[in-house]
């Protein structure tokens, strides 16, 4: 229910009550540097987990496109399996053409990376998206920056090839606080 915290998502509550209270007392136009950021670059995913839906998994989208909307499904009433969640389509097919992803990377370079305490990449499947690998590369190329940051990905660890898992293991060594 709405008053419960998922035991599947390991960090559902990220802000302390005093942080929320402080934010309500600040002027609306104050510049605020985030301490925690959860980001999804894309919904591309290779699995159709029972707790997921088309908004977060292209495998679910493919299933609905092939067989149609689910009938007589018991759900929370949000209609997740009635369509393919077209609103979740990426703004562009290639990362370099997506203005939102480009804006994120610019923000990252212009101070976010130096102030963030935690970044969590969700999906879809994060290791299927170039944006995740771009952050791993950034940590490799900037070993003096982002030392205080926790870097977590919500991965199913089921890559399409074993080489991708090997790459993840190799790249994770360059991130000081990888979870």
Regions found by a protein language model. Give the residues of each.
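Core AdoMet radical
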Residues: 34-44, 55-99, 114-130, 142-164, ...
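Local cysteine-cluster metal-coordination motifs and their immediate loop/turn environment
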Residues: 1, 44-55
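Compositionally biased, low-structure terminal segments
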Residues: 11, 16, 82, 137-140
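Alpha-helical packing segments of well-folded alpha/beta enzyme cores
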Residues: 37, 104-107, 115, 135
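Short, well-ordered amphipathic alpha-helices
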Residues: 104-105, 132-141, 164-170
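A Trp-anchored, charged/polar loop motif used as the substrate-binding/catalytic surface
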Residues: 16-30, 96-110, 163-168
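Residues in intrinsically disordered, low-complexity segments of regulatory proteins
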Residues: 27, 86, 106-107, 137, ...
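Flexible, acidic/Gly-rich N-terminal and inter-domain linker regions that tether
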Residues: 1-35, 55
């Amino acid at each position: 229910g709405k008053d419960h915290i998922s035991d599947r998502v390991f960090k559902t509550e990220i802000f302390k009550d005093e942080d929320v209270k402080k934010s309500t007392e600040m002027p609306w136009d104050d510049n605020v540097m985030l301490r925690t950021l959860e980001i999804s670059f894309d919904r591309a995913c290779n699995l159709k987990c029972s707790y997921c839906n088309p908004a977060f998994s292209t495998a679910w989208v493919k299933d609905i496109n092939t067989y149609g909307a689910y009938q007589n499904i018991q759900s929370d009433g949000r209609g997740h399996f009635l369509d393919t969640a077209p609103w979740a389509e990426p703004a562009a097919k290639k990362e370099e053409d997506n203005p939102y992803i480009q804006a994120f990377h610019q923000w990252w370079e212009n101070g976010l990376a130096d102030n963030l305490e935690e970044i969590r990449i969700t999906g879809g499947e994060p290791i299927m998206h170039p944006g995740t690998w771009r952050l791993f590369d950034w940590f490799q190329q900037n070993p003096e920056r982002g030392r205080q940051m926790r870097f977590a990905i919500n991965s199913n660890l089921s890559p399409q090839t074993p080489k991708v898992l090997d790459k993840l293991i190799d790249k994770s060594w360059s991130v000081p606080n990888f979870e």
